[in-house]
């Protein structure tokens, strides 16, 4: 048997609540909700061995939902040894059913399915104490627990689930058939908090100040007396990562900012002014706009543009690093990788590789770096909170997500200097009006897209025009995995449309994209 001492255990700022992922679309969301209760959490696949889980020294376990039936061939199984670790356990949906089955309860095909909003009847217990006796919850199940394990109290039911929740408070075990992690379960966060703080007895220690202090100490330990390079993009992730490292090692960090000419209005000046003023970091700016535009000439295909921009960025960054080092040595490269990136890339923990994430990828072989990724355990909202804790200005911390290829993938068609200027002007108007209307905190991001290869007929003054359309794509989201279009007030949309068609040359039409994700992605390209 593999002993815990033989297992590579990732360094974390605190002992985690482990979310055991049984294939749920909401596993990351569960981890986020646990952290919103000020408790550190991580996602681990159900294929992890009991030795691996024990080695992580969890303070509690949450068993996630999943698409399978506990009776199906090849369905994920719950190792009963998990329930003997002596830590509190909460089962959700499939995890609830697997938990019930492992403990001797009965899971059956009742013939009644529940998908979507369902009425939950609270029958007592501690998990739902002080909450409404009848409350809406979000269900997604075909099978149901029809008999709780011995020693468990049935504390809730629904039309399709005679046992919709059970608990054994003295054993610190509980489970719910519904999804407390989704916004469609209004009291779900209270139920999760009740489990974490009352059942598990965990304190609220996962705070921005504690996170920042722990990460700074980790970086200080990793880099020691070494030197580091950080590629700044102008976005919040790289800015906060750089600020943490700068706080840890001071002037032994050098930041490189590549201006590829595809930035939004004022972004280069903002980085040079606000970031340096807030951190005191050494910053080297590379003006590569002309090089990027030359490389993009004649290219309209979205993937082709992405590859060219990525390749040119690597070359510009490589040249800047060589100039900065000038014969000296920097052993570490700082990247703003976030926790969703780690999970989606496989995370080294047996999960499927959905996509690769690299802030700076494909560096030449003779540039040898050890990666420093101080944010790799954080979600976006936590990154913003840490940034505020470090004193970064709101102009950086509250910045909407912006793609690495910049405006290059918000121009549908070939990228030219004139088209970039047109889109940049329209984008600045949209940002000004949304900020003036107080909508920045309601919108995850608002891509502004130029349909450069499309023209439409219009009338301005006494003449006929033949101009380009601009597309507004305001979306609301928590993590960009799913998104809904934001209901921007009509009067704000009217001001935006009027200003763009009056102030931006060759644009005579503004349209609104009202498609959710899925089926559409947030960006057009």
Swiss-Prot record:
Cite the Pfam families for this sequence.
GATase, GMP_synt_C, NAD_synthase
Q: EC class of this enzyme?
A: ligase
Q: Which residues form the Glutamine amidotransferase type-1 domain?
A: 16-205
Positions annotated to bind ATP:
233-239
The pathway entry for this protein reads as:
Purine metabolism; GMP biosynthesis; GMP from XMP (L-Gln route): step 1/1
What is catalysed by this protein?
XMP + L-glutamine + ATP + H2O = GMP + L-glutamate + AMP + diphosphate + 2 H(+)
The protein's superkingdom reads Bacteria
Its EC number is 6.3.5.2
Annotated Gene Ontology cellular components are: cytosol
Q: Cite the GMPS ATP-PPase domain residue spans from the record.
A: 206-399
InterPro entries given in the database record: Class_I_gatase-like, GATASE, GMP_synth_C, GMP_synth_GATase, GMP_synthase, GMPS_ATP_PPase_dom, NAD/GMP_synthase, Rossmann-like_a/b/a_fold
Q: Name one GO molecular function term.
A: ATP binding
Catalytic site: 93 (nucleophile), 179, 181
Q: Which UniProt keywords apply?
A: ATP-binding, Glutamine amidotransferase, GMP biosynthesis, Ligase, Nucleotide-binding, Purine biosynthesis
Recorded hits in PANTHER family, A to Z, give: GMP SYNTHASE [GLUTAMINE-HYDROLYZING] (PTHR11922:SF2), GMP SYNTHASE-RELATED (PTHR11922)
Subunit composition?
Answer: Homodimer.
Q: What does this protein do?
A: Catalyzes the synthesis of GMP from XMP.
What the entry lists under HAMAP family is as follows:
GMP_synthase
This one is known as: GMP synthase [glutamine-hydrolyzing]
Which gene produces this protein? guaA
């Amino acid at each position: 048997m593999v002993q815990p001492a033989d297992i590579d255990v990732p360094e974390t700022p605190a002992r985690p609540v482990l979310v055991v992922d049984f294939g749920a679309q909401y596993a990351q969301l569960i981890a986020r909700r646990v952290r919103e209760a000020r408790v550190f959490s991580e996602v681990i696949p159900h294929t992890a061995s009991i030795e691996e889980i024990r080695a992580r020294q969890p303070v509690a376990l949450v068993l996630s939902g999943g698409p399978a039936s506990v009776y199906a061939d090849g369905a994920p199984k719950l190792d009963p040894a998990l329930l003997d670790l002596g830590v509190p356990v909460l089962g959700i949906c499939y995890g609830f059913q697997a938990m019930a089955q492992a403990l001797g309860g009965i899971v059956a095909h009742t013939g009644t399915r529940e998908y979507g909003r369902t009425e939950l009847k609270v029958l007592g217990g501690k998990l739902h104490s002080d909450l409404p006796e009848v409350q809406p919850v979000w269900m997604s199940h075909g099978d149901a627990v029809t008999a709780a394990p011995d020693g468990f109290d049935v504390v809730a039911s629904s039309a399709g689930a005679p046992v919709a929740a059970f608990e054994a408070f003295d054993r610190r075990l509980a489970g719910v058939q519904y999804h407390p992690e989704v916004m469609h379960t209004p009291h779900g966060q209270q139920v999760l908090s009740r489990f974490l703080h009352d059942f598990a007895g965990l304190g609220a220690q996962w705070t921005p100040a504690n996170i920042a202090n722990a990460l700074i100490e980790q970086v200080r330990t990793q880099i020691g007396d070494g030197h580091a390079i950080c590629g700044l993009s102008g976005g919040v992730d790289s800015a906060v990562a750089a600020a943490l490292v700068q706080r840890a090692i001071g002037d032994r960090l050098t930041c490189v900012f590549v201006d590829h000419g595809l930035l939004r209005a004022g972004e280069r000046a903002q980085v040079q002014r606000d970031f340096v003023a807030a951190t005191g970091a050494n910053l080297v700016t590379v003006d590569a706009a002309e090089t990027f535009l030359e490389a993009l000439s004649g290219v309209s295909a979205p993937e082709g543009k992405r590859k060219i921009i990525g390749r040119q960025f690597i070359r510009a960054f490589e040249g800047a690093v060589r100039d900065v080092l000038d014969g000296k040595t920097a052993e570490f490269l700082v990247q703003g990788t976030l926790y969703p990136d780690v999970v989606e890339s496989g995370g080294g923990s047996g999960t499927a590789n959905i996509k690769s994430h690299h802030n700076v990828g494909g560096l030449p072989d003779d540039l040898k770096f050890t990666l420093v990724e101080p944010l790799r355990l954080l979600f976006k909202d936590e990154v913003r909170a840490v940034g505020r804790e470090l004193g970064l200005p709101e102009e950086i911390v509250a910045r909407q997500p912006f793609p690495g290829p910049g405006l290059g993938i918000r121009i549908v068609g070939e990228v030219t200097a004139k088209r970039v200027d047109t889109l940049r002007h329209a984008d600045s108007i949209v940002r000004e009006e949304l900020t003036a209307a107080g909508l920045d905190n309601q919108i995850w991001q608002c891509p502004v897209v130029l349909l450069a290869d499309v023209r439409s007929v219009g009338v301005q003054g006494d003449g006929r025009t033949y101009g380009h359309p601009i597309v507004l794509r305001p979306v609301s989201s928590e993590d960009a995995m799913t998104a809904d279009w934001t209901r921007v007030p009509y009067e704000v949309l009217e001001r935006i449309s009027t200003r763009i068609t009056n102030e931006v040359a060759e644009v005579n039409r503004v349209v609104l994209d009202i498609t959710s994700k899925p089926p559409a992605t947030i960006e057009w390209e």
